[in-house]
Regions:
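A short beta-strand-to-loop transition that corresponds to the Sensor-1 phosphate-sensing loop
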Residues: 102-107, 113, 128-130, 390-392
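Conserved P-loop NTPase "ATPase switch" module shared by AAA+ and STAND
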Residues: 67-83
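Short regulatory helix/loop adjacent to the ATP-binding pocket of P-loop NTPases
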Residues: 108-124, 138-140
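Loop/turn-to-beta-strand initiation segments
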Residues: 20, 69-71, 95-101
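Interdomain hinge/linker elements that couple catalytic modules in large macromolecular machines
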Residues: 137-303, 307-313, 317, 325-328
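Conserved catalytic/switch belt of AAA+ P-loop NTPases
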Residues: 85-108, 115-117
């Protein structure tokens, strides 16, 4: 399988060269180990998926570091987080940079551990599945922000995405871009590995029930998070569902998009929206077995929206930026039948709010951006250019402050 160059590589190299310790987080099989082995060949490697390695790190840490000298890459470090105290001691006794690279698939858990043990000593980055830019070899690596300057710069490197539904269905895990990899077999193995290596260590749930839960969540990608509704489908308590959702979030399977809130928007809904990080995994769990059936299905709109949101998040993480405090959605409690009290995404940057609509349409209308004016109520922010990301062929202004963009502009 040929190595696909990852967009975040220059960011990681810069951070390794300037910090004593660098943490790379991301879901299983997004390519963390492959990237580190390919780009940081001088680092020794220890994998905490291996129980004997973990045991030595826990019980005989001095011997562990003698057997695994720096510069050292520790994979799946969350499986033995006690090692962080030893790493803290080592980095505090040295002025060297680039001593440790750590990786793991439990993002929030790891970030908590780092803040407790390695605060101020570690640089944190996130690796996601392949972006469309990476799949198509686009070198442009700025986060999506619908300014005139961004659109003009992005337009210079546009590549047409001819097989968009094939990629939505396939998903973004790098191994799937090996021409011989069977889609169903890959995801069957992925789910089994996820249950065995991650879930068994985090919850006391049988595999069948948790898989039923995964399927119920996948069927709701792009929807407001409703714990009670999922609990009814799975047959477990609502507190259990809340705990399990938090585990999916921690392990990079789902993302909870928070609502935009401001004192001027008193009627805004406060519930997060739930998105699967990978559309291929969501398709597998909900049994959409071909791209053609998915494209024509009742879930096509939600799956398309999930894909676009994921691509925007990737554009941030691939530039080394934290998107959690920039990207939101808005929905008012007085939502009407035409949906004119809802904005799919609100992107905030430098005191400007950019309303973004996501439409599975090749013929967008100006009315699709009708809710944008609600942001004018936020007096301490400006409203920026409104955007409709859709399946249109070329950039088209629908009115002076609203533009329809092909998804290739992400």
């Amino acid at each position: 399988m040929p190595y696909i160059q990852r967009a975040i590589t220059p960011i990681l190299k810069q951070r390794v060269s300037t910090s004593k310790c660098m943490l790379l987080v991301g879901a299983r099989q997004v390519g963390k180990s492959t990237l580190i082995k390919h780009e940081f060949k001088d680092f020794n490697r220890a994998n905490f998926d291996d129980r004997l390695t973990r045991m030595q790190a826990k019980e005989e840490s001095k011997l562990f570091f003698l057997n695994n000298p720096q510069p050292l890459f520790i994979d799946e470090v969350q499986k033995e987080s006690s090692i962080l105290e030893d790493i803290k001691q080592i980095v505090d006794e040295s002025d060297e940079r680039g001593m440790f690279i750590l990786s793991g698939s439990q993002k929030l858990e790891l970030m908590k551990g780092m803040s407790e043990s390695l605060a101020g000593r570690v640089s944190i980055s996130e690796l996601t599945g392949l972006s469309m830019r990476e799949i198509y070899g686009v070198k442009f690596n700025r986060h999506f922000i619908p300014t005139d300057a961004y659109i003009k710069e992005r337009e210079k490197e546009i590549v047409k995405y001819d097989n968009i539904w094939e990629i939505i269905h396939k998903g973004s895990y790098p191994e799937l871009y090996d021409i011989d990899r069977d889609w169903q077999e890959y995801y069957s193995s992925y789910v089994a590995t996820y249950l065995e290596r991650d879930i068994n260590e985090l919850v006391a749930a049988d595999g069948i029930t948790f898989t039923k839960f995964l399927t119920a969540v996948a069927a709701r990608t792009g929807e407001l998070l409703n714990y009670s509704n999922i609990a009814g489908d799975v047959g477990v308590s609502e507190p259990t569902i809340k705990n399990w959702i938090s585990i999916l979030e921690r392990t990079g399977i789902v993302y909870l998009l928070q609502p935009y809130s401001a004192s001027a928007l008193k009627r805004a809904i406060k519930t997060p929206k739930l998105y699967f990080r990978d559309t291929g995994l969501a398709c597998y769990l909900t049994r959409w077995l071909t791209a053609d059936t998915l494209k024509c299905s009742a879930v096509a709109g939600n799956m398309f929206e999930t894909f676009v949101v994921s691509e925007i998040l990737k554009s941030y993480s691939n530039e080394g930026k934290d998107y959690r405090f920039n990207i939101f959605y808005y929905r008012g409690k007085d939502r009407n039948a035409s949906g004119e009290n809802e904005i799919d995404l609100v992107i905030e940057e430098d005191g400007v709010l950019y309303p973004v609509e996501i439409k599975m349409s090749g013929n967008p209308k100006a009315s699709m951006g009708a809710t944008n004016q609600v942001l004018d109520k936020v007096s301490d922010k400006k409203r920026g250019l409104g955007v409709i990301l859709c399946l249109i062929d070329k950039k088209t202004y629908l009115r002076e402050n609203l533009v329809a963009l092909p998804i290739e502009f992400i």
